[in-house]
């Protein structure tokens, strides 16, 4: 997919599909016509390649972590990996056991939290299988914990913010305890506030850096040579494979696709000062268009699936309205009012400005080139679910022969998917105790 244009005359989207490589053998380029268009490419889809002198001159194997070559055998190879973010923290422990030498090139250290991975005992597995309530309760408690991390990690004024940062520091001391690790700990200690960049959750990243065949390199990279990487201090690392764990062009939403809305207005022009959308899903002047995992919907502390599920339910209502009117022989064109989009984004930007993400001393993929936070959501996952479990039709410009019928609906509501606990442990205990007392009282009465 390379281009999508809204046809004002026919109230349709026309999407151009180009065939590349072997797909050319299947036929020519073609156009798909639709009543509604949904972008489900998300935020993390286009690899970001580092601007390093000589990168293209490297004669060994180079691959971005998001474009992994599974046919390449790393066994016994001298491997370099650029980056120590979330992707690198997952790759490094896995490949270190197969390489003859692994050099980790770090520009900025990351805050690392413990994952606490451990096997679930057979007893607990049986309990979760045969006592569904116990399984659901455990899952809900996990959700409660993840939601509690929001305030502690994202809001610097929170009483728990310094505590959770200390948990990360203790995790490092636990995993790198020896005096010999003093220099390594210093190199891995962040000099920026906790949570202003993406936090790594790992139990095996730090220990892997202690392996004899693993070296952490913190000197700036000078250039890539045909045989490896030369550092600013003159050191040269010979490599067979160079892995680029350098992330994605996260703030450049839909950057590989040309989108044109009403009057031929391009999405790139609309978002010239930063991507924004109403509830992260709909954009002014782009009718019958929805986005999943769009601007300001990323969660830095909980599962993104929660957001995408909420968005899917919302966008489905928009699609349903368009298709229902089409079946009745009517046309329908839905787009958010500009003032609604503006007010919504003013609110979330105001809240985000008070978060750790906005720290001026911190650069991250959460911010665009202007310093505006365009990726992250400003609240908890539950708050977002509650804000997207209803559709207020007055928020939208509705045109077409079916417009009046849709406008009369007012506000449509649906039940959100509740993942958190409904009742506290204390209340459960009181209810259980009351049930036991009632049972005993009943038994005594029956016995007499």
Task: Name what the model sees in each region.
Residues 52-62, 227-280:
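Central helical "cap/lid" subdomain
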Residues 1-43:
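Feature captures the FAD/FMN-dependent oxidoreductase FAD-binding
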Residues 23-36, 73-77, 232-241, 245:
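Core beta-strand elements of the Rossmann-like FAD/NAD(P) dinucleotide-binding domain
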Residues 1-14, 71, 212-232:
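A conserved short coil-to-beta-strand element within the FAD-binding core of flavoproteins
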Residues 14-16, 183-200:
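Helix-loop-beta segment of a Rossmann-like dinucleotide-binding subdomain
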Residues 37-180, 214, 237, 266, ...:
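Rossmann-like dinucleotide-binding core of oxidoreductases
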């Amino acid at each position: 997919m390379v281009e999508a244009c809204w046809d004002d005359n026919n109230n349709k989207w026309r999407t151009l599909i180009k065939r590349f490589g072997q797909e050319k053998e299947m036929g020519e380029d073609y156009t798909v016509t639709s009543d509604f268009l949904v972008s489900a490419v998300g935020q993390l889809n286009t690899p970001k390649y580092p601007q390093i002198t000589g990168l293209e001159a490297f004669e060994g194997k180079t691959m971005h972590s998001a474009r992994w070559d599974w046919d390449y055998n790393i066994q016994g190879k001298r491997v370099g990996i650029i980056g120590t973010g979330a992707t690198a923290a997952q790759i490094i422990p896995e490949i270190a056991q197969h390489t003859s030498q692994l050099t980790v090139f770090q520009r900025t250290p990351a805050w690392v939290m413990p994952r606490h991975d451990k096997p679930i005992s057979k007893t607990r597995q049986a309990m979760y299988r045969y006592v569904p309530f116990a399984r659901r309760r455990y899952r809900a408690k996990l959700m409660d914990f993840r939601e509690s991390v929001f305030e502690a990690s994202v809001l610097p004024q929170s009483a728990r913010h310094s505590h959770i940062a200390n948990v990360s520091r203790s995790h490092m001391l636990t995993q790198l305890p020896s005096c010999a690790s003093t220099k390594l700990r210093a190199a891995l200690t962040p000099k920026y506030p906790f949570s202003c960049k993406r936090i790594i959750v790992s139990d095996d990243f730090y220990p892997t850096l202690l392996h004899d065949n693993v070296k952490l390199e913190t000197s700036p990279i000078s250039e890539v040579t045909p045989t490896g990487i030369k550092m600013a201090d003159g050191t040269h690392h010979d490599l067979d494979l160079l892995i680029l764990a350098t992330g994605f062009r996260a703030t450049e939403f839909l950057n590989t696709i040309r989108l044109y809305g009403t009057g031929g207005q391009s999405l790139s022009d609309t978002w010239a000062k930063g991507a924004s959308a109403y509830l992260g899903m709909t954009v002014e002047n782009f009718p019958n268009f929805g986005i999943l995992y769009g601007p300001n919907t990323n969660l830095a502390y909980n599962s993104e699936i929660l957001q995408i599920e909420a968005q899917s339910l919302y966008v489905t209502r928009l699609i349903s309205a368009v298709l229902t009117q089409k079946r009745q022989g009517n046309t329908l064109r839905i787009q958010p009012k500009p003032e609604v989009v503006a007010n919504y984004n003013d609110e979330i930007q105001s809240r985000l400005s008070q978060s750790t993400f906005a720290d001026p001393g911190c650069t991250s993929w959460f911010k665009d080139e202007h310093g505006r936070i365009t990726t992250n959501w400003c609240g908890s996952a539950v708050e977002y679910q509650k804000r997207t479990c209803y559709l207020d039709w007055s928020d939208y410009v509705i045109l077409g022969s079916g417009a009046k019928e849709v406008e009369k609906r007012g506000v449509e509501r649906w039940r959100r998917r509740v993942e958190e606990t409904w009742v506290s442990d204390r209340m459960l205990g009181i209810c259980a105790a009351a049930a036991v007392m009632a049972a005993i009282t009943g038994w005594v009465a029956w016995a007499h």
